From Swiss-Prot:
SUPFAM superfamilies: Adenine nucleotide alpha hydrolases-like. InterPro entries: NAD/GMP_synthase, NAD_synthase, NH(3)-dep_NAD(+)_synth, Rossmann-like_a/b/a_fold. GO terms for cellular component: cytoplasm. One of its GO terms (molecular function) is NAD+ synthase (glutamine-hydrolyzing) activity. ATP binds at G45, I46, S47, G48, G49, Q50, D51, S52, T158, K187, T209. It catalyses: deamido-NAD(+) + NH4(+) + ATP = AMP + diphosphate + NAD(+) + H(+). The keyword Transferase does not apply. It comes from Bacillus thuringiensis subsp. konkukian (strain 97-27). PANTHER family: NH 3 /GLUTAMINE-DEPENDENT NAD + SYNTHETASE (PTHR23090), NH(3)-DEPENDENT NAD(+) SYNTHETASE (PTHR23090:SF7). This is NH(3)-dependent NAD(+) synthetase. Belongs to the NAD synthetase family. HAMAP family: NadE_ammonia_dep. Homodimer. Mg(2+) binds at D51, E163.
C-alpha cells in the first residue's frame, strides 16, 4: 500500500460519494451521538466559510429531526469575530441559510487583547502574529465550551480530510471539539454537499481563509499552505499529482501527526 493509499484510508476518504446518502449518514451520526451522550444538542462557531456553514446546517437538520421524532435538542450558532470581520456579510448569509435555533455573537477582541497585553508585560516580549492567531482560535474554543457546558451542548468541529491531511488547524483551538461531522470529506465534496443542500453559491465558492493574522487579514489558506485545495483533493481522491506536490502533502501529514492524536505518552507508538 502506498503512502497515499494509507493516508486515504486513515482519513476515511471515499473518492466518489452519493450526495444525498452522504448528507443522510452525517445527520444520522449527529443524532445518534447526541442521543448516546445524553447531551441537549450542539454549539458551533460560524465564520461564514464553507466548513462551518455545512456543519451548521447539518446540525440544525439533526436537532429538527430529533424534535420531530419526539425528542428534545437544540442548536446554538455562535459568531466569534475579532473586532470587525471583513466578510461579515458572508457570516450573516451563512446564518440565514443555517437557520439555527439560536444565534449569539461574542466579540473575542477584548479577551485576546487583554491576554496579549498581559503576556507582553510579564514576559517582556510581544506575541508573534502567528501565535496571537492561535490564541484567537483557542479563545473561540473556550467560548464554545463555556456555552456548551452551561447549556449541556456538544461542541461541533469542522475538520475535514483536506485540513486533516495538512494539520491546517490550531491544536486545542478549532481542533478542539466533541465530534466531527465532516470527517472524510475533501474540500470539493463539502462544496458539493452545500450545493445539494441549497446554499447560496457565495458560501461555497468564496476563497477559504482561516483569517487569524492581524498582519495579513483574510490571507488565503492556499497561500499559507503553498498547496491548492484542488491539489489536496486530487491527492486524497487517489489521483496523480505532481511529485513535488505529493512530497509537500506527505511531509505536512507526517509532521502534523501529533495534531491528529491525543497527547503523547511513553506508552504510545505513533510518535516513535
Amino acid at each position: 500500500m502506498t503512502l497515499q493509499e494509507q493516508i486515504m484510508k486513515a482519513l476515511h476518504v471515499q473518492p466518489v460519494i452519493d450526495l444525498k446518502a452522504e448528507i443522510r449518514k452525517r445527520v444520522d451520526f449527529l443524532k445518534d451521538y447526541v442521543k448516546k451522550t445524553g447531551a441537549k444538542g450542539f454549539v458551533l462557531g460560524i465564520s461564514g466559510g464553507q466548513d462551518s456553514t455545512l456543519a451548521g446546517r447539518l446540525a440544525q437538520l439533526a436537532v429538527e429531526e430529533i424534535r420531530n421524532e419526539g425528542g428534545n435538542a437544540t442548536f446554538i450558532a455562535v459568531r466569534l469575530p475579532y473586532k470587525v470581520q471583513k466578510d461579515e456579510d458572508d457570516a450573516q448569509l451563512a446564518l440565514q441559510f443555517i437557520q439555527a435555533d439560536q444565534s449569539v455573537a461574542f466579540d473575542i477582541a477584548s479577551t485576546v487583547d487583554a491576554f496579549s497585553n498581559q503576556y507582553e508585560n510579564l514576559l517582556d516580549e510581544s506575541l508573534t502574529d502567528f501565535n496571537k492567531g492561535n490564541v484567537k482560535a483557542r479563545i473561540r474554543m473556550v467560548t464554545q465550551y463555556a456555552i456548551g457546558g452551561q447549556k449541556g451542548l456538544l461542541v461541533i468541529g469542522t475538520d475535514h480530510a483536506a485540513e486533516a491531511v495538512t494539520g491546517f488547524f490550531t491544536k486545542f483551538g478549532d481542533g478542539g471539539a466533541d465530534l466531527l461531522p465532516l470527517t472524510g470529506l475533501t474540500k470539493r465534496q463539502g462544496r458539493a454537499l452545500l450545493q445539494e443542500l441549497g446554499a447560496d453559491e457565495r458560501l461555497y465558492l468564496k476563497m477559504p481563509t482561516a483569517d487569524l493574522l492581524d498582519e495579513k487579514p483574510g490571507q488565503a489558506d492556499e497561500t499559507e499552505l503553498g498547496i491548492t485545495y484542488d491539489q489536496l483533493d486530487d491527492y486524497l481522491e487517489g489521483k496523480t499529482v505532481p511529485a513535488d506536490v505529493a512530497e509537500k502533502i506527505e511531509k505536512r501529514y507526517t509532521v502534523s501527526e501529533h495534531k491528529r492524536q491525543v497527547p503523547a505518552s511513553m506508552f504510545d507508538d505513533w510518535w516513535k
